UniProtKB/Swiss-Prot annotation:
It holds the Pfam family NDK. It catalyses: a 2'-deoxyribonucleoside 5'-diphosphate + ATP = a 2'-deoxyribonucleoside 5'-triphosphate + ADP; a ribonucleoside 5'-diphosphate + ATP = a ribonucleoside 5'-triphosphate + ADP. HAMAP family: NDP_kinase. GO terms for molecular function: ATP binding; metal ion binding; nucleoside diphosphate kinase activity. Major role in the synthesis of nucleoside triphosphates other than ATP. The ATP gamma phosphate is transferred to the NDP beta phosphate via a ping-pong mechanism, using a phosphorylated active-site intermediate. SUPFAM superfamilies: Nucleoside diphosphate kinase, NDK. InterPro entries: NDK-like_dom, NDK-like_dom_sf, Nucleoside_diP_kinase, Nucleoside_diP_kinase_AS. Keywords: ATP-binding, Cytoplasm, Kinase, Magnesium, Metal-binding, Nucleotide metabolism, Nucleotide-binding, Phosphoprotein, Transferase. ATP binds at K9, F57, R85, T91, R102, N112. This is Nucleoside diphosphate kinase. Its EC number is 2.7.4.6. The active site is at H115 (pros-phosphohistidine intermediate). The keyword Flavoprotein does not apply.
């Protein structure tokens, strides 16, 4: 089973969208194997967005992601990374397909409600940044015995 990292950003938390997003994830068949509400500090934010250091938008990005709590999750399932990315929609909500999380809830590219790993490598790196191994659980969903 593939794992991916997904995070409801501060704008999503502040707007009360955690439940809606979790519902969509579970209805799609992805399993949440770790989750926590947390406040990201600057050090963790810089590690998370290290590839953007030196870019013109870096300080705004760090300021936003540390501005309020986030809901961090590890999702598990067949093709979990691609499935989560399709559910989220394009980064720019104006370009996101109707019915995606960003098309339905995001206001602006810089306030786009949700983050998800874009590759297996980034998923592994982000999961390790945000979760200790003992925080990631393994369990069987009731429907698993029937599939």
């Amino acid at each position: 089973m593939e794992q991916t990292y997904v995070m409801v950003k501060p704008d999503g938390v502040e707007r009360g969208l955690i439940g809606e997003i979790v519902t969509r994830i579970e209805k799609k068949g992805l399993k949440i194997v770790a989750g926590k509400l947390m406040q990201i500090d600057r050090e963790l934010a810089e590690k998370h967005y290290a590839e953007h250091i030196g870019k013109s938008f870096f300080e705004d990005l760090i300021g936003f992601i540390t501005s309020g709590p986030v809901f961090a999750m590890v999702l598990e399932g067949d093709d979990a990374i691609a499935t989560a990315r399709r559910m989220m929609g394009k980064t720019n909500p104006l370009e996101a397909d109707p019915g995606t999380i960003r098309a339905d809830y995001a206001i602006h590219t810089n306030r786009n409600v949700i983050h998800g790993s874009d590759s297996l490598e980034s998923a592994k790196r982000e999961i390790q940044l945000f979760f200790a191994p003992q925080e990631i659980l393994s369990y069987q969903k009731a429907i698993d015995t029937w599939i």
